[in-house]
């Protein structure tokens, strides 16, 4: 069954300032890139071309900054038409047709069963799972890492939330989603 509500990701995120969010993407003003970019207005030069890719328009830095800030949660387009762009706006897109995934420390059991029972636990044993879980190849801290909830939202982002507090740890905008953020 479903237990009691532990936290509301949207409400926790809404309580944060837009500037304190860690939103990342991959963008390069000169084409293909493999390096992460912080999705902030101070990085407008690297983000502008990717945001308007294949649109046939060349936006100003001010237009791109407005969009970047809007995606981060600023009311830069005065959505409620009250002549104020300082209003708070909901920062989390609706989570629709996305299934969350919880990732935490490895918990898989192993067994050295002499019967070779073909269970998942035996498979882990013969493939060195125990050594992986506690060794350097798992980043040493693997066995004690915090539990994180990952979910996609209709704001174009993959969000990572701390499973205990609901705090957004970071969000990632896939490069192919950047041109769609204007819609």
Predicted segments, located by residue:
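A fold-level detector for beta-propeller and closely related beta-sheet-rich head/sensor domains
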Residues: 1-183
């Amino acid at each position: 069954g479903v237990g009691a509500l532990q936290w509301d990701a949207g409400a926790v995120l809404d309580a944060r300032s837009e500037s304190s969010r860690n939103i990342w993407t991959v963008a390069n003003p000169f084409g293909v890139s493999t390096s992460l970019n912080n999705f902030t207005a101070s990085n407008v030069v690297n983000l502008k071309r990717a945001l308007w890719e294949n649109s046939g328009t060349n936006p100003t830095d001010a237009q791109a900054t407005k969009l970047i800030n809007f995606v981060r949660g600023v009311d830069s387009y005065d959505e409620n038409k009250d002549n104020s762009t300082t209003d708070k706006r909901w920062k989390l897109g609706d989570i629709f047709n996305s299934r969350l995934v919880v990732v935490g420390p490895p918990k898989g059991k192993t067994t050295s069963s002499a019967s070779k029972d073909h269970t998942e636990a035996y498979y882990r044993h013969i493939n060195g799972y125990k050594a992986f879980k506690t060794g350097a190849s798992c980043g040493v801290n693997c066995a004690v890492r915090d539990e994180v909830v990952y979910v996609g939202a209709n704001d174009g982002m993959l969000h990572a939330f701390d499973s205990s507090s609901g705090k957004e740890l970071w969000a990632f905008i896939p490069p192919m989603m950047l041109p769609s953020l204007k819609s």
